């Protein structure tokens, strides 16, 4: 159905907080994943167990890009600053989410070192480049943050995304995609976007 807001300001504020709330919830999951990684605990298993409680909100760690969720919170915090209030929770969530690409890149390098694989020129594949799963849109994709972080260590990752707009990705980011059939004999594979076809992959499919 259609909900009639009291006025345009209420409608715009509602849209902003819809996306801000999601941004903050994902940021919380991302922070938990960082903590659990240091503790040696599997985040997915923790969330599955916590999800058995009827009122647990099911959000998952991941990259937050696109032109809505990662942008809308700043409209609210900017206006708050103009009114003399400095946002804390909203901006904290933004900092966490904006840093996840770098975090993933760094942890990939650490994993290579632990596996005694040479870091420079390591064969690393990134699966997915769109800003969210099961879409073609690459605008404001945070996967590019992973690419840039790996490049800092002398790694030029191989990127595959059968759903992404390849022309758009090359125009916006200067990256070219590889066919999934070429993802073989890699030192590391990062599943950056949860496309349905990636969820069905097993180790044998990329080994």
Region locations from a protein language model:
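Structural/interface elements that position substrates and couple domains in central-metabolism enzymes
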Residues: 1-207
């Amino acid at each position: 159905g259609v909900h009639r807001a009291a006025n345009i300001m209420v409608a715009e504020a509602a849209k902003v907080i819809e996306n801000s709330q999601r941004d903050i919830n994902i940021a919380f999951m991302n922070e938990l994943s960082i903590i659990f990684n240091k503790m040696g605990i599997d985040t997915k298993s923790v969330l599955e167990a916590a999800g058995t409680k009827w009122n647990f909100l099911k959000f998952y760690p991941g990259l937050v890009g696109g032109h809505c969720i990662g942008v809308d919170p700043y409209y609210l915090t900017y206006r708050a600053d103009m009114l003399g209030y400095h946002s804390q929770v909203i901006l904290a969530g933004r900092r966490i989410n904006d840093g996840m690409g770098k975090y993933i890149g760094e942890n990939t390098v650490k994993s290579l070192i632990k596996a005694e694989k040479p870091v420079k020129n390591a064969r690393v594949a990134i699966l997915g480049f769109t800003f969210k799963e099961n879409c073609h849109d690459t605008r404001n994709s945070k996967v590019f943050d992973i690419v840039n972080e790996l490049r800092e260590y002398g790694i030029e990752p191989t990127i595959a995304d059968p759903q992404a707009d390849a022309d758009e990705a090359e125009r916006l980011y200067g990256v070219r995609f590889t066919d999934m059939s070429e993802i073989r004999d890699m030192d590391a594979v990062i599943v950056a976007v949860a496309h349905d076809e990636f969820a069905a992959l097993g180790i044998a499919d990329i080994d």
